[in-house]
Each structure stands twice: as structure tokens, then as C-alpha cells.
């Protein structure tokens, strides 16, 4: 009887102490462009949550990499038009992060609807999340 009780108690302890891995999620994608003298400036942002964090002493550290693809109004896909790494450390658990991208589009880009795809990877777990948004280039 004691043996079964110890096995059950050990099993419950393991379950209670196990850490649930969160799922990486991108949300609130936005993009827009405004006209400049010789083209446009495109701004895009996406928020990210559910990433792994290393606890180092009293600090929490997250590391995300991102890539931005742009699909032009005539269907041409430009992969990796912007790339980067967000390496954030703060003294409390990080709830979410915002990733921003800013690009200059010259006058060779035609007016129309464009699609921005944000691909985010949690460097600590390898999880990926993808989200897109649309914007219009107008004269």
C-alpha cells in the first residue's frame, strides 16, 4: 500500500512541477505606407506572445528572430526584404513584444495592394508563427 501511495505521490509531483510550454503567437499585424518625394515609406508591425524566456538571476530574457516578405501588387514575392533579431532582457516576465519594420520603396513600385508577411521564430524553442497584413500604395 505504501509503495502505491509513493508512486502516485511521485507522479503527481512530477505533473505539478512540469512547466507548460506556451505556443508562440503573432497578433495585431499592421502595415501602411505614405508617399515621399521619390517613392514611399512602408511601416509594418506585429506583436508576439507565448515565447520562451530564460530566467537569469532576477532577469528574464527572450530572443526572437524575424523575417518580412513583401508581395507586390503584381504578385511578385520579395522574400526576406527585412530581417532582424529582438533580444530583450528585463527584470520582470515579458508579456509580449512588438516587432517593427520600416522600409523605403522607390518609385519602381507600382500603386496597388501589397501583402506584408511577418515570420517570427522563438530562438529558444524553435517555434515559428506567421501573420500577414495588407496596405495600399497610392499616389
Regions found by a protein language model. Give the residues of each.
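Positively charged n-region of N-terminal signal peptides that target proteins for export
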Residues: 1-4
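Short, surface-exposed loop/turn segments at beta-strand-coil junctions that are enriched for proline
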Residues: 104-110
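C-terminal motif of bacterial Sec signal peptides marking the signal peptidase cleavage site
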Residues: 13-16
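Sec-dependent N-terminal signal peptides
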Residues: 6-9
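Contiguous segments within soluble domain cores/interaction surfaces
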Residues: 18-99, 119-120, 131-133, 137
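Surface-exposed loops/turns
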Residues: 38, 110-111
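A short tyrosine-centered beta-strand micro-motif
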Residues: 112-119
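Short, solvent-exposed loop/turn segments at the edges of extracellular beta-sandwich modules
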Residues: 122-125
